[in-house]
């Protein structure tokens, strides 16, 4: 199977006023759209930036609403780099993820600690469902990156960074052709959109 993240070690009057206010509120709602990721090690809440990465957020939410992430795992964990998940089950079976998204890494968002970005193959527009959470400031992944594209950031952890830090420290090993796989599965039990007021 193709490894998802290729990295070289060493993204008019009162009516007008009213309309602008409505647009401002809608803009605010988009900026503050959140999801909660429940894992076997605790909850992680993420704020998604639909203003700067609209296609990526839409694609991610489509997978969320379909329940794609339920019972997937963090299958690649590298302390000092990132934790990657959303594509495999605990028995390392890859889930089908046919919908791809255009690379939006040139959106000004950096692969800083605590941000979430899309994993992909060497094809810059191959991102589908797999994502990773940066546990370091991975500036080499930012647009234009080493391949002229970089990796698209589309949100950040707003609660539960302690959980991310626990995950990054788990013991890992090999599972078939896959490296850096947690020896004890870190399961994503669900990802859901956070309701207003939560």
Model-predicted regions and their roles:
Residues 5, 17-198:
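Cyclophilin-like peptidyl-prolyl cis-trans isomerases
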Residues 10-18:
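Hydrophobic h-region of N-terminal signal peptides that target proteins for export
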């Amino acid at each position: 199977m193709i490894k998802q993240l290729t990295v070289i070690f060493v993204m008019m009057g009162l009516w007008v006023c009213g309309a602008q206010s409505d647009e401002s509120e809608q803009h605010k709602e988009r900026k503050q759209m959140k999801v909660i990721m429940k894992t076997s090690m605790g909850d992680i809440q993420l704020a998604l930036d639909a203003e700067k990465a609209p296609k990526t957020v839409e694609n991610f939410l489509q997978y969320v609403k379909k329940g794609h992430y339920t019972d997937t795992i963090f299958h690649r964990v590298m302390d000092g780099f990132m934790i990657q998940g959303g594509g495999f089950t605990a028995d390392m079976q890859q889930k089908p993820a046919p919908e791809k998204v255009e690379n939006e890494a040139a959106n000004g968002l950096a692969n800083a600690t605590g941000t979430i970005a899309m994993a992909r193959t060497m094809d810059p527009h191959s991102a589908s469902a797999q994502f990773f959470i940066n546990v370091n400031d991975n500036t080499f992944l930012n647009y234009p990156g080493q391949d002229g594209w970089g990796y698209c950031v589309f949100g950040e952890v707003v609660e539960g960074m302690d959980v991310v830090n626990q995950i990054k420290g788990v013991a890992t090993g090999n599972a078939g052709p896959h490296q850096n796989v947690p020896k004890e599965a870190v399961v994503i039990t669900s990802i859901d959109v956070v309701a207003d007021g939560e």
